[in-house]
Structure formats: structure tokens, C-alpha cells
Design a protein with these regions (language model features):
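Short S/T/G/P-rich N-terminal loop/turn motif that feeds into the first structured element of a domain
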Residues: 1-54, 64-71, 88-114
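Conserved RNP beta-strands of RNA recognition motif
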Residues: 57-61
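Short arginine-rich
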Residues: 81-83, 87-89
Length: 114
């Protein structure tokens, strides 16, 4: 996993925060498939994900319309339903517009705020 190389702002970030249920129940396979499928969608910029007890996945999109398009992809809708039924005790989705981004000098964008 690496830090997503995003363009200059503005762009859209979809933040998915979750608490899992016990057991895999096919989660790992579906998670890998969703990451692969998202990368094929128009307007996809990248994704970052981390999980311990609390999982956080941030996907980046060129705009709100691209993010909304991903939400409606048929296979993603199946994953959403399965998540509600079997994988998540709790989750929250937040959609935000990134207006400024900066990082470590050795990262993809340098250290200066943009």
C-alpha cells in the first residue's frame, strides 16, 4: 500500500470509516475486488486504506459526479448490501472536497501547502 498520488486540488475524497463484525465471511475477497473495480471507474484518482479494529478507506475522485457514479456501479451495490448484512457492525461515509493538500518532501507532492 502506498499514499495515493493525487492531482492539485480541488478533487473529491470519499471517507469510509467502519467497525467490522467477527469473521471474514468473504470480506477479503470482496474488498480486493472493490479496490480493483474502483480503479477502473471514470474519474478514479486513487485509494488509501488502513484497518486495525477501526477501518478507514479514503478513495479520491476527480469530482462529486465521479464519486457518485462509483456508488451506483452494480457490483459495488452488491458489496454495499453484503457489507450491511454481514461485514460491518457500524460504518459512516463522508464525502468532502479537498481544497488543499501537502506532504513530506519525499512524498508525491512535496512539503509546500497547495
Amino acid at each position: 500500500m502506498s499514499i495515493a498520488a493525487t492531482p492539485e486540488p480541488p478533487y473529491t475524497a470519499v471517507i469510509f470509516t467502519s467497525l467490522r463484525t467477527d469473521g471474514d465471511h468473504g470480506y477479503d475477497v470482496m474488498s480486493a475486488r472493490m479496490e480493483e473495480l474502483a480503479a477502473q471507474q471514470p474519474g478514479y484518482l486513487g485509494m488509501e486504506s488502513a484497518r486495525e479494529r477501526l477501518g478507514i478507506t479514503v478513495s479520491y475522485w476527480v469530482d462529486d459526479a465521479a464519486a457518485a457514479g462509483w456508488k451506483q456501479v452494480a457490483e459495488h451495490l452488491v458489496g454495499q448490501t453484503r457489507g450491511q448484512q454481514a461485514w460491518y457492525r457500524d460504518y459512516e461515509v463522508r464525502v468532502a472536497t479537498v481544497t488543499r493538500a501537502y506532504g513530506h518532501p519525499q512524498g508525491p507532492r512535496g512539503s509546500s501547502p497547495k
